[in-house]
Amino acid sequence: MSLSATQNLPNLTLLRLMNDHTGAFAEAIRGVNTPELQVADNDYAVGLVVDKVAHSPYAASTLIFVVEDDAQDGPDHIDAHRSIAFVAGPHVKQGQLVSEHYTTVSLIRTIEEILGIRPQNLHDAGVRPMIEIFDLSKTNWTYTAAPSSLLLNTQLPFELVQPNVRHADGGDSPKPLHDAAWWAAKTKGFDFTDADRNDSAVYNRILWEGTVGEKPYPAERSGLDLRQNRGALLKLEDPTRRAPTVPAPSAE
């Protein structure tokens, strides 16, 4: 069914695209069989949704909010609570920096305000909508999806979806670090029948090894405030002090 077949889209649509969870490498179809390829495939699917809306009669009256599930289920040098979000559609500022702190709840509150829905609980009731990202004078917008050139390594039928498709990064064809056989062996015994059925800590380390290589895995942050009394915390000593001399054992 085409987007405009019914001429009556619902006021709110929730859409889940889950290939960015990655997995099932031995069974993956059309060569989308490594994490890099699966994430690129998922990104392209999101782009195609936005592309379809942007070139439809609903473009002037549809806002699209995009967030990730389990955006960072694991530590690195940045707080593991961080995430990304995208907003596309009319009245969205473009090419501007907005220095506001938003959370997923901010996004939910914004959707509620736009649709005239009452807050669900105290959590979203106490959060401001994301008004700083909007400019009501900006009505024109468009978007054309462009797949990553990573996907050139697959058998995805681009021409059936987008004739004369243009790849986002110039058409070069980088290769994943490891092939499907490596990933299938590393995840043997894993359950990929649905998201989040495996030990996330174990899988995170496999993903790190397979996509980053020999770089050490990030240590999990303790959350302790180490700004005060750092010398004592690090057990620093006076560098002028010498270690005591220990006499050699007697030959007797």
Task: Describe the predicted segments one by one.
Residues 1-252:
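N-terminal pro-sequences and low-complexity stem/linker regions of secreted or lumenal proteins
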